[in-house]
């Protein structure tokens, strides 16, 4: 009973962070299963495993996206690493609103349940994660599936908004003595910017899907031209949320990578303030570029010119971050432990994804490439090899601090190389498919595309082996005995550590700080 009470009613940021990690792992495995089903269907031309049920294919695509974005990356990055380490890094005893933190987590399992139900009732929700009307309207999806998906999004949105309020309050009001804003670790800054993005963008999504809900069930016509509505309005509202959302997914990763690169290069991050302002700029600019997802809907040519230019401007702060990471490594004594491998892999592959993003920013080119596999390749490079690599990097970096046990280094490196090989083999060929005009969200294709698709599917099977490796690492780490105890600061002598989490024992006490730490100076 005591255990049940501890985990169900927890107000401790570490316990809630651990719950987020477990939840993210479960959702991640489910999302991966769906992606493998997608790749099995696309492994060769013709109908493969879904027996010609093309609606089911789109249900898989939709569920894969929602699971990975709202139930894997966001809970693990913001809920997991954010909850665990933001209070420790700023020298706070806990989050500002511990019970709000608890409800933020417990809104997610019901939300996940609603999403899974949506896939199981009637013919499921085969709309893609964008849920565009009229396809998501009552005439095209007549059952309750889309409505369930909408309620699922509402719940996970409320969870994220409450969480972001909590993070903003915590970071502004609960820093320890001497911890000025300009001394905040970069991961804390990244979570702060992310929280503001969530707070400003999610209500817009909530408005859009609520209007969709009333269009479907109460005969309103927000998105129906027959009653004076406009489906393009939905696209504007959705992408005004959807574009900041992709920065929400990657920004905490930026913070994690900054810490890791600094630690394993043995020197402070190059250009700390530049890094902070780059993140803030990315956050601000993220709200000014949404229509680049809509170049094909007949926007005015001047509008397209603006959104092309604005999108390219985002590459500037992003480039500042990448070159600062490289400058941090420059001349350092680099140790290629597993976290650093994932961090370097992140920098390399995120850069590739960013470059294809610059290609797609050109409205003229995008009209040819829109809704092809080129776009799929682009965002999977920044998510599947950006966000996910950052998650793995953060896991290996902090796992000793979280569980108080060291992970098997060799197996971690094997996990990295298998995953690195698998994801590249999966997504690199998609650039070629897109350039040849293979459209997204279609379960069958002409024979000409067979070769690259077969390669891509093979790559996804390798990625699954990598994920199995990862869970073996987790199992070994959790079941290792007292001889595998983790030092307070496993990566450096405590005197050389630049952030607070390495000053406390591994794992930290239930109440981290007996008295709040005072910060005298920081090495940067």
From Swiss-Prot:
Q: Which residues participate in Fe(II)-heme a binding?
A: 64, 380
GO MF annotations in UniProt: cytochrome-c oxidase activity; heme binding; metal ion binding
Where on this chain does Ca(2+) bind? 41, 46, 443
| Ranges that cross the membrane | 18-38, 66-86, 103-123, 148-168, 186-206, 237-257, 269-289, 312-332, 340-360, 379-399, 414-434, 458-478
The topology of this chain with respect to the membrane is: Multi-pass membrane protein
Q: How is the cofactor bound?
A: Binds 2 heme A groups non-covalently per subunit. Binds a copper B center.
Q: From the Swiss-Prot or TrEMBL record, state where the protein is found.
A: Mitochondrion inner membrane
User: At which positions is heme a3 bound?
Assistant: 378
* BP term (GO), one: electron transport coupled proton transport
Q: Which EC class, in a word?
A: translocase
Assembly, per entry: Component of the cytochrome c oxidase (complex IV, CIV), a multisubunit enzyme composed of a catalytic core of 3 subunits and several supernumerary subunits. The complex exists as a monomer or a dimer and forms supercomplexes (SCs) in the inner mitochondrial membrane with ubiquinol-cytochrome c oxidoreductase (cytochrome b-c1 complex, complex III, CIII).
What protein does this entry describe?
Cytochrome c oxidase subunit 1
Give the source species: Beta vulgaris (Sugar beet)
Which lineage? Eukaryota, Viridiplantae, Streptophyta, Embryophyta, Tracheophyta
